């Protein structure tokens, strides 16, 4: 699953798949799931969590 291929146009900007558009501004999505991830959920460059996508182990 390529998280970078799921983006949303939002006025003059584009939101990542971990964000939603609110009045031409990207904000972290409030979607959650019950998956347990050993290293937490994957985050975008803004710190927003992707729902149900586990983060890789720290290097």
Swiss-Prot record:
Main location: secreted
Ranges where the Antistasin-like domain occurs: 28-54
Molecular function terms from GO: serine-type endopeptidase inhibitor activity
Alphabetized SUPFAM superfamilies for the sequence: Leech antihemostatic proteins
GO cellular component: extracellular region
Family note: Belongs to the protease inhibitor I15 (antistasin) family.
Biological function: Strong inhibitor of mammalian trypsin, plasmin and acrosin.
Protein name: Bdellastasin
């Amino acid at each position: 699953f390529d998280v970078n291929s799921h983006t949303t146009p939002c006025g003059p900007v584009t939101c990542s798949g971990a964000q939603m558009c609110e009045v031409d501004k990207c904000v972290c999505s409030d979607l959650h799931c019950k998956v347990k991830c050993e290293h937490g959920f994957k985050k975008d460059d803004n710190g927003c969590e992707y729902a149900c996508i586990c983060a890789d182990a720290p290097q």
